[in-house]
Amino acid sequence: KQPRGKYDILLSDSITDHMLGSRQLLQQLCTRLGVEPGVPRSDGRVTVDTTSCTGLCDQGPALLVNGYAVSRLSEQRIEQICQLIETATETSQWPAEFFAIEDNILRRDLLLAEETTAASPDGSALRALIDNGSDALLDTIEKSGLRGRGGAGFRTGMKWRFCKQAEADSHYVVCNADEGEPGTFKDRVLLNNYADSVFEGMTLCAGIIGAQQGYLYLRGEYRYLLDPLHARLQQRRNNGLLGQG
C-alpha cells in the first residue's frame, strides 16, 4: 500500500471538475504545499492526488481530505486549506462551511414524493407487508409500475418476483450506491437526506424475497456518509423497524 500523508487530499478528476478548473487548482495545491501528485511530502504531513468523480459535480470543483468532502473550491479556498495544513490544524477545527454539502434539488416531483414522508417514512408500508403478506404487497408494487432509478428503468416488481422465485439457500438484498458516472449524484442525495426511505425499501424487499440480510455498498468517495448511515440504522432498530443484524 502506497504511504499517505497525515492530510490525504484527493481532488476529483471527473470531466465536469476539469471544466470547472480543477487541474489549475491541483497545480496550485501542489505548488503551494511543495508536493508532487501521489507522492507524500518528505515530512509526511500531506499527500495530494486525484480520485474518480466524487459525486459533487453539482457543486464542484471538489476534493476529499481524509475522506471528507470539500466542495465549491476556488483559489481562495485552496489557499485557506494550505494554510490550515501548514499550521497542522486538525480537520475537526476547519471551517464548517468547507464541509457543507447541498442537495440542489429544484423539483422533487414523484421521484422523491413529499419531503416529510419520503425522508422519514412512518413504517406503514412495513405494516402492510406484515398484515397483508408478501404476495399482496408484491402485486401492489407490480401494478404500480414502479421502476428502478437506473438508466434501464427495469420494473421493480418484476425484479423482486424473479428474486423471490430464484432457488437458493439464502437470499440477500444489495443496494449498490456506487455512482461513478460524471455528473451523477442521485445516490448521494438519497443517502444524505432519504436514507430512511432507502433502508425501508430494502426491508420491504427482504420481506418479499425472503432475505434475512441486506448490504449497502458505499463508494469510498462517500465515506463521509458512513457514520450518519450507521446512526439511521440504529435508530430504525430502536424504533422496531429493523432487525438487530
PLM features per residue range, with description:
Residues 1-245:
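Feature of Fe-S/electron-transfer and energy-metabolism proteins
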